[in-house]
Protein backbone atom coordinates (compact mmCIF):
# COMPACT_ATOMS: atom_id res chain seq x y z
CA UNK A 1 0.00 0.00 0.00
CA UNK A 2 1.36 3.37 -0.92
CA UNK A 3 2.41 5.94 1.59
CA UNK A 4 -0.12 8.64 2.30
CA UNK A 5 0.08 12.32 3.04
CA UNK A 6 -3.00 12.01 5.25
CA UNK A 7 -3.03 10.47 8.70
CA UNK A 8 -6.21 9.79 10.72
CA UNK A 9 -4.65 11.65 13.64
CA UNK A 10 -4.49 14.78 11.49
CA UNK A 11 -8.26 15.20 11.91
CA UNK A 12 -10.23 16.25 14.96
CA UNK A 13 -13.47 14.36 15.51
CA UNK A 14 -16.64 16.41 15.07
CA UNK A 15 -19.90 14.64 15.87
CA UNK A 16 -23.25 16.23 15.09
CA UNK A 17 -26.09 14.42 16.81
CA UNK A 18 -29.73 15.14 16.00
CA UNK A 19 -32.28 13.99 18.57
CA UNK A 20 -35.99 13.20 18.05
CA UNK A 21 -38.46 16.02 17.54
CA UNK A 22 -39.22 17.67 20.88
CA UNK A 23 -42.37 19.78 21.10
CA UNK A 24 -40.99 21.63 24.13
CA UNK A 25 -38.27 23.22 21.96
CA UNK A 26 -40.33 23.30 18.74
CA UNK A 27 -37.85 21.25 16.79
CA UNK A 28 -35.06 18.69 16.87
CA UNK A 29 -32.40 19.17 19.57
CA UNK A 30 -28.87 19.14 18.14
CA UNK A 31 -25.64 18.46 19.98
CA UNK A 32 -22.14 19.13 18.64
CA UNK A 33 -19.19 17.35 20.25
CA UNK A 34 -15.56 18.10 19.40
CA UNK A 35 -12.73 15.65 19.94
CA UNK A 36 -14.98 13.30 21.89
CA UNK A 37 -14.76 15.58 24.94
CA UNK A 38 -15.75 19.17 24.28
CA UNK A 39 -19.53 19.24 24.26
CA UNK A 40 -21.14 22.50 23.23
CA UNK A 41 -24.48 23.80 24.42
CA UNK A 42 -27.38 22.14 22.66
CA UNK A 43 -29.26 23.98 19.97
CA UNK A 44 -32.16 22.95 17.79
CA UNK A 45 -33.21 22.51 14.19
CA UNK A 46 -36.67 23.79 13.36
CA UNK A 47 -39.29 21.18 12.53
CA UNK A 48 -39.92 23.28 9.43
CA UNK A 49 -36.95 21.54 7.82
CA UNK A 50 -39.58 19.03 6.71
CA UNK A 51 -40.95 18.48 4.21
CA UNK A 52 -37.78 18.93 2.18
CA UNK A 53 -38.35 20.17 -1.35
CA UNK A 54 -35.39 20.23 -3.70
CA UNK A 55 -34.78 23.28 -5.86
CA UNK A 56 -33.12 21.13 -8.48
CA UNK A 57 -29.83 22.99 -7.98
CA UNK A 58 -27.51 20.92 -5.71
CA UNK A 59 -25.36 23.86 -4.59
CA UNK A 60 -28.41 25.89 -3.56
CA UNK A 61 -29.93 22.93 -1.75
CA UNK A 62 -26.66 22.26 0.06
CA UNK A 63 -26.35 25.84 1.29
CA UNK A 64 -30.00 25.91 2.35
CA UNK A 65 -29.59 22.65 4.25
CA UNK A 66 -26.45 23.97 5.97
CA UNK A 67 -28.15 27.24 6.93
CA UNK A 68 -31.18 25.37 8.26
CA UNK A 69 -29.08 22.94 10.29
CA UNK A 70 -27.11 25.79 11.89
CA UNK A 71 -29.87 28.40 12.06
CA UNK A 72 -29.66 28.41 15.87
CA UNK A 73 -26.99 30.88 17.04
CA UNK A 74 -25.78 28.36 19.61
CA UNK A 75 -25.00 25.88 16.85
CA UNK A 76 -23.38 28.50 14.63
CA UNK A 77 -21.09 29.43 17.51
CA UNK A 78 -20.22 25.77 18.09
CA UNK A 79 -19.45 25.28 14.40
CA UNK A 80 -17.24 28.37 14.37
CA UNK A 81 -15.40 27.16 17.46
CA UNK A 82 -14.75 23.81 15.81
CA UNK A 83 -13.24 25.55 12.78
CA UNK A 84 -11.01 27.60 15.06
CA UNK A 85 -9.80 24.40 16.73
CA UNK A 86 -8.90 22.78 13.42
CA UNK A 87 -9.69 23.14 9.74
CA UNK A 88 -9.38 19.35 9.43
CA UNK A 89 -12.45 17.82 11.01
CA UNK A 90 -13.79 14.30 10.64
CA UNK A 91 -17.56 14.93 10.49
CA UNK A 92 -19.84 12.17 11.77
CA UNK A 93 -23.56 12.88 11.45
CA UNK A 94 -25.59 10.84 13.91
CA UNK A 95 -29.36 10.93 13.50
CA UNK A 96 -31.26 9.13 16.25
CA UNK A 97 -33.44 6.24 15.15
CA UNK A 98 -36.50 8.03 16.55
CA UNK A 99 -35.80 10.92 14.19
CA UNK A 100 -35.99 8.57 11.22
CA UNK A 101 -37.83 11.07 9.06
CA UNK A 102 -34.63 13.12 8.82
CA UNK A 103 -32.73 10.31 7.14
CA UNK A 104 -34.47 11.12 3.88
CA UNK A 105 -32.74 14.52 3.66
CA UNK A 106 -29.73 14.76 1.33
CA UNK A 107 -27.17 15.50 4.03
CA UNK A 108 -24.31 14.79 1.63
CA UNK A 109 -25.22 18.09 -0.06
CA UNK A 110 -24.28 20.17 3.02
CA UNK A 111 -22.41 23.17 1.67
CA UNK A 112 -20.73 26.11 3.36
CA UNK A 113 -20.05 28.84 0.85
CA UNK A 114 -18.50 27.20 -2.18
CA UNK A 115 -17.43 24.05 -0.33
CA UNK A 116 -19.43 20.81 -0.23
CA UNK A 117 -18.37 19.28 3.08
CA UNK A 118 -18.75 15.69 1.86
CA UNK A 119 -16.37 16.34 -1.04
CA UNK A 120 -13.55 18.22 0.71
CA UNK A 121 -10.33 16.54 1.84
CA UNK A 122 -10.40 18.47 5.13
CA UNK A 123 -13.83 17.21 6.20
CA UNK A 124 -14.30 13.43 5.76
CA UNK A 125 -18.06 12.91 6.10
CA UNK A 126 -20.19 9.94 7.11
CA UNK A 127 -23.54 8.98 8.52
CA UNK A 128 -22.58 7.46 11.84
CA UNK A 129 -24.50 4.53 13.28
CA UNK A 130 -23.51 3.67 16.87
CA UNK A 131 -23.80 -0.09 17.31
CA UNK A 132 -23.26 -2.04 20.52
CA UNK A 133 -20.48 -4.19 19.10
CA UNK A 134 -16.78 -4.40 19.77
CA UNK A 135 -14.65 -2.09 17.63
CA UNK A 136 -12.93 -3.86 14.76
CA UNK A 137 -9.19 -3.41 14.52
CA UNK A 138 -7.82 -2.32 11.13
CA UNK A 139 -7.12 -5.28 8.85
CA UNK A 140 -3.45 -6.29 8.99
CA UNK A 141 -3.76 -9.44 6.88
CA UNK A 142 -2.40 -9.30 3.37
CA UNK A 143 -3.50 -9.61 0.71
CA UNK A 144 -6.72 -7.67 1.19
CA UNK A 145 -9.37 -9.94 -0.28
CA UNK A 146 -12.20 -8.57 -2.43
CA UNK A 147 -15.17 -10.57 -3.70
CA UNK A 148 -16.81 -8.88 -6.69
CA UNK A 149 -20.37 -9.79 -7.68
CA UNK A 150 -21.66 -8.42 -10.99
CA UNK A 151 -25.31 -9.31 -11.54
CA UNK A 152 -26.86 -8.89 -15.00
CA UNK A 153 -30.14 -10.83 -15.21
CA UNK A 154 -31.28 -11.57 -18.77
CA UNK A 155 -34.79 -10.20 -18.22
CA UNK A 156 -33.94 -6.94 -16.44
CA UNK A 157 -35.09 -4.71 -19.26
CA UNK A 158 -38.11 -6.71 -20.38
CA UNK A 159 -39.47 -7.41 -16.90
CA UNK A 160 -38.39 -4.38 -14.84
CA UNK A 161 -37.49 -1.76 -17.46
CA UNK A 162 -33.93 -1.59 -16.10
CA UNK A 163 -30.84 -1.11 -18.23
CA UNK A 164 -28.60 -4.15 -18.71
CA UNK A 165 -25.32 -4.16 -16.79
CA UNK A 166 -22.22 -4.02 -19.00
CA UNK A 167 -20.37 -6.86 -17.26
CA UNK A 168 -17.15 -6.57 -19.28
CA UNK A 169 -16.92 -2.81 -18.80
CA UNK A 170 -17.66 -3.02 -15.08
CA UNK A 171 -15.03 -5.70 -14.61
CA UNK A 172 -12.38 -3.78 -16.54
CA UNK A 173 -13.17 -0.64 -14.55
CA UNK A 174 -12.71 -2.43 -11.23
CA UNK A 175 -9.60 -4.24 -12.40
CA UNK A 176 -8.11 -0.92 -13.43
CA UNK A 177 -8.85 0.64 -10.04
CA UNK A 178 -7.59 -2.32 -8.04
CA UNK A 179 -4.48 -2.95 -10.14
CA UNK A 180 -2.88 0.22 -8.76
CA UNK A 181 -1.97 -1.87 -5.69
CA UNK A 182 0.97 -4.28 -5.50
CA UNK A 183 0.20 -7.88 -6.39
CA UNK A 184 0.92 -9.09 -2.85
CA UNK A 185 -1.32 -6.43 -1.34
CA UNK A 186 -4.72 -7.22 -2.85
CA UNK A 187 -6.57 -10.21 -4.27
CA UNK A 188 -9.77 -9.76 -6.29
CA UNK A 189 -12.09 -12.67 -7.08
CA UNK A 190 -15.01 -12.31 -9.51
CA UNK A 191 -18.06 -14.49 -8.98
CA UNK A 192 -18.96 -16.41 -12.13
CA UNK A 193 -22.35 -15.88 -13.76
CA UNK A 194 -25.09 -16.49 -13.04
CA UNK A 195 -24.72 -14.52 -9.81
CA UNK A 196 -27.10 -16.54 -7.66
CA UNK A 197 -27.47 -16.15 -3.88
CA UNK A 198 -26.35 -19.77 -3.52
CA UNK A 199 -23.13 -19.16 -5.45
CA UNK A 200 -22.47 -16.04 -3.43
CA UNK A 201 -22.78 -17.95 -0.18
CA UNK A 202 -20.53 -20.74 -1.43
CA UNK A 203 -17.91 -18.20 -2.51
CA UNK A 204 -18.00 -16.63 0.96
CA UNK A 205 -17.44 -20.07 2.47
CA UNK A 206 -14.54 -20.78 0.13
CA UNK A 207 -13.01 -17.50 1.19
CA UNK A 208 -12.51 -18.88 4.70
CA UNK A 209 -10.95 -22.20 3.66
CA UNK A 210 -7.40 -23.02 4.67
CA UNK A 211 -7.47 -20.75 7.70
CA UNK A 212 -8.08 -17.62 5.63
CA UNK A 213 -9.81 -14.71 7.34
CA UNK A 214 -12.56 -14.49 4.73
CA UNK A 215 -13.24 -11.65 2.34
CA UNK A 216 -12.49 -8.19 3.64
CA UNK A 217 -14.58 -6.46 0.96
CA UNK A 218 -17.82 -7.46 -0.79
CA UNK A 219 -18.50 -5.38 -3.91
CA UNK A 220 -21.86 -5.70 -5.66
CA UNK A 221 -22.56 -4.21 -9.09
CA UNK A 222 -26.11 -4.34 -10.36
CA UNK A 223 -29.58 -3.03 -9.68
CA UNK A 224 -31.53 -2.66 -6.47
CA UNK A 225 -35.09 -1.79 -5.55
CA UNK A 226 -36.96 -0.34 -2.58
CA UNK A 227 -40.60 -0.89 -1.71
CA UNK A 228 -42.02 2.08 0.17
CA UNK A 229 -45.20 0.16 0.92
CA UNK A 230 -43.33 -2.75 2.50
CA UNK A 231 -40.28 -0.76 3.62
CA UNK A 232 -38.00 -3.42 2.15
CA UNK A 233 -34.85 -3.21 0.08
CA UNK A 234 -33.70 -5.84 -2.40
CA UNK A 235 -30.87 -6.55 -4.82
CA UNK A 236 -31.50 -8.11 -8.21
CA UNK A 237 -29.45 -11.31 -8.21
CA UNK A 238 -29.96 -14.18 -10.68
CA UNK A 239 -31.40 -17.67 -10.67
CA UNK A 240 -29.64 -20.63 -12.30
CA UNK A 241 -31.24 -19.75 -15.65
CA UNK A 242 -29.85 -16.22 -15.48
CA UNK A 243 -33.20 -14.56 -14.79
CA UNK A 244 -33.75 -11.89 -12.15
CA UNK A 245 -34.15 -13.08 -8.58
CA UNK A 246 -34.71 -10.60 -5.78
CA UNK A 247 -32.56 -10.98 -2.69
CA UNK A 248 -34.23 -9.16 0.19
CA UNK A 249 -32.25 -7.10 2.69
CA UNK A 250 -32.87 -9.51 5.56
CA UNK A 251 -31.74 -12.42 3.40
CA UNK A 252 -28.40 -10.79 2.61
CA UNK A 253 -27.84 -9.75 6.22
CA UNK A 254 -28.62 -13.27 7.45
CA UNK A 255 -26.33 -14.83 4.86
CA UNK A 256 -23.39 -12.68 5.91
CA UNK A 257 -24.07 -13.32 9.60
CA UNK A 258 -24.05 -17.09 9.03
CA UNK A 259 -20.50 -17.00 7.68
CA UNK A 260 -19.03 -16.06 11.04
CA UNK A 261 -16.65 -13.47 9.57
CA UNK A 262 -18.20 -10.24 8.33
CA UNK A 263 -16.67 -8.22 5.49
CA UNK A 264 -15.11 -4.98 6.73
CA UNK A 265 -16.60 -3.10 3.80
CA UNK A 266 -19.66 -3.68 1.62
CA UNK A 267 -19.90 -1.58 -1.54
CA UNK A 268 -23.31 -1.56 -3.22
CA UNK A 269 -23.05 -0.04 -6.66
CA UNK A 270 -26.76 -0.39 -7.20
CA UNK A 271 -29.59 2.05 -7.85
CA UNK A 272 -31.63 2.84 -4.75
CA UNK A 273 -29.66 0.40 -2.58
CA UNK A 274 -29.35 2.98 0.21
CA UNK A 275 -32.90 4.36 0.17
CA UNK A 276 -34.77 3.74 3.41
CA UNK A 277 -38.23 4.13 4.81
CA UNK A 278 -38.96 7.35 6.69
CA UNK A 279 -40.83 5.23 9.21
CA UNK A 280 -37.74 3.46 10.54
CA UNK A 281 -34.08 4.40 10.19
CA UNK A 282 -32.91 0.78 10.23
CA UNK A 283 -35.15 -0.68 7.55
CA UNK A 284 -32.85 0.15 4.66
CA UNK A 285 -30.25 -2.30 3.45
CA UNK A 286 -27.16 -0.28 4.41
CA UNK A 287 -28.12 0.39 8.06
CA UNK A 288 -29.09 -3.27 8.42
CA UNK A 289 -25.67 -4.34 7.25
CA UNK A 290 -23.98 -1.98 9.71
CA UNK A 291 -26.24 -3.08 12.56
CA UNK A 292 -25.29 -6.68 11.78
CA UNK A 293 -21.62 -5.87 12.27
CA UNK A 294 -20.23 -4.58 8.96
CA UNK A 295 -18.02 -1.58 9.90
CA UNK A 296 -18.65 0.42 6.72
CA UNK A 297 -21.14 0.37 3.85
CA UNK A 298 -20.99 2.51 0.73
CA UNK A 299 -24.21 2.65 -1.25
CA UNK A 300 -26.56 4.88 -3.20
CA UNK A 301 -29.42 6.84 -1.59
CA UNK A 302 -31.31 7.45 -4.82
CA UNK A 303 -31.33 6.57 -8.50
CA UNK A 304 -27.81 6.99 -9.84
CA UNK A 305 -26.46 6.85 -13.39
CA UNK A 306 -24.23 3.94 -14.31
CA UNK A 307 -21.45 6.35 -15.28
CA UNK A 308 -21.55 8.06 -11.89
CA UNK A 309 -21.42 4.75 -10.04
CA UNK A 310 -18.49 3.60 -12.18
CA UNK A 311 -16.46 6.81 -11.79
CA UNK A 312 -17.14 6.93 -8.08
CA UNK A 313 -16.13 3.30 -7.50
CA UNK A 314 -12.87 3.55 -9.42
CA UNK A 315 -11.68 6.67 -7.58
CA UNK A 316 -12.89 5.39 -4.22
CA UNK A 317 -10.81 2.22 -4.35
CA UNK A 318 -7.70 3.97 -5.60
CA UNK A 319 -7.85 6.45 -2.72
CA UNK A 320 -8.85 3.91 -0.07
CA UNK A 321 -5.88 1.74 -0.94
CA UNK A 322 -3.66 4.82 -0.81
CA UNK A 323 -4.44 5.95 2.75
CA UNK A 324 -6.84 3.36 4.28
CA UNK A 325 -9.50 5.87 5.44
CA UNK A 326 -12.92 5.00 4.05
CA UNK A 327 -14.64 8.33 4.78
CA UNK A 328 -11.82 10.35 3.25
CA UNK A 329 -11.84 8.09 0.18
CA UNK A 330 -15.58 8.72 -0.26
CA UNK A 331 -15.02 12.48 -0.09
CA UNK A 332 -12.25 12.27 -2.68
CA UNK A 333 -14.37 10.14 -5.01
CA UNK A 334 -17.25 12.59 -4.67
CA UNK A 335 -14.90 15.44 -5.54
CA UNK A 336 -14.03 13.62 -8.76
CA UNK A 337 -17.73 13.46 -9.63
CA UNK A 338 -18.14 17.20 -9.06
CA UNK A 339 -15.14 17.92 -11.27
CA UNK A 340 -16.72 15.77 -13.98
CA UNK A 341 -19.94 17.76 -13.69
CA UNK A 342 -22.04 14.86 -12.40
CA UNK A 343 -25.31 16.25 -11.01
CA UNK A 344 -25.85 13.12 -8.90
CA UNK A 345 -22.56 13.49 -7.00
CA UNK A 346 -24.38 13.53 -3.64
CA UNK A 347 -26.09 10.18 -4.22
CA UNK A 348 -23.29 7.94 -2.87
CA UNK A 349 -23.56 7.61 0.90
CA UNK A 350 -21.23 6.21 3.54
CA UNK A 351 -22.69 4.58 6.64
CA UNK A 352 -20.15 3.51 9.23
CA UNK A 353 -19.74 2.62 12.89
CA UNK A 354 -16.04 3.53 13.16
CA UNK A 355 -14.81 6.74 14.74
CA UNK A 356 -11.66 7.19 12.66
CA UNK A 357 -12.66 5.67 9.31
CA UNK A 358 -9.59 3.41 9.20
CA UNK A 359 -10.35 0.04 7.58
CA UNK A 360 -6.89 -1.27 6.78
CA UNK A 361 -3.66 -1.06 8.76
CA UNK A 362 -0.95 1.29 7.57
CA UNK A 363 1.98 -0.25 5.72
CA UNK A 364 4.37 0.05 8.66
CA UNK A 365 1.92 -1.84 10.90
CA UNK A 366 1.68 -4.64 8.35
CA UNK A 367 5.47 -4.82 8.08
CA UNK A 368 5.70 -5.00 11.89
CA UNK A 369 3.32 -7.97 11.91
CA UNK A 370 5.28 -9.73 9.18
CA UNK A 371 8.48 -9.19 11.18
CA UNK A 372 6.86 -10.86 14.18
CA UNK A 373 6.05 -13.84 11.97
CA UNK A 374 9.60 -14.04 10.62
CA UNK A 375 11.06 -14.01 14.12
CA UNK A 376 8.81 -16.80 15.32
CA UNK A 377 6.18 -14.74 17.12
CA UNK A 378 2.49 -15.50 17.18
CA UNK A 379 -0.10 -14.11 14.86
CA UNK A 380 2.09 -14.02 11.76
CA UNK A 381 0.73 -14.07 8.25
CA UNK A 382 2.00 -15.35 4.96
CA UNK A 383 2.38 -12.80 2.20
CA UNK A 384 3.49 -13.82 -1.23
CA UNK A 385 2.56 -15.62 -4.38
CA UNK A 386 2.15 -14.61 -7.99
CA UNK A 387 -0.93 -12.47 -8.38
CA UNK A 388 -2.25 -10.00 -10.87
CA UNK A 389 -5.79 -8.67 -10.82
CA UNK A 390 -6.38 -9.00 -14.54
CA UNK A 391 -5.11 -12.55 -14.76
CA UNK A 392 -6.85 -14.08 -11.79
CA UNK A 393 -9.38 -16.86 -12.21
CA UNK A 394 -12.96 -16.29 -11.18
CA UNK A 395 -14.66 -18.09 -8.33
CA UNK A 396 -17.42 -20.27 -9.64
CA UNK A 397 -19.18 -20.78 -6.32
CA UNK A 398 -19.19 -24.54 -6.76
CA UNK A 399 -17.75 -26.96 -4.25
Please describe what each predicted stretch is:
Residues 135-241, 268:
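A domain-level signal for caspase-like cysteine endopeptidase catalytic cores
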Residues 124-129, 217-315:
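Catalytic cores of nucleophile-dependent amide-cleaving enzymes
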Residues 1-126, 138-140:
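Non-catalytic, solvent-exposed interaction/assembly segments
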Residues 72-83, 128-134, 197-206:
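Short alpha-helical segments and helix-capping/turn motifs at coil-helix boundaries
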Residues 391-399:
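C-terminal, disordered and strongly charge-biased linear tails with low hydrophobicity
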Residues 90, 143-144, 261-264, 293-295, ...:
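Short coil/turn connectors at secondary-structure junctions
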Residues 109, 114, 118-133, 241-261, ...:
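Caspase-like cysteine protease fold
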Residues 102-110, 157-158, 276-277, 360:
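Short helix/loop capping segments that flank catalytic or ligand/cofactor-binding pockets
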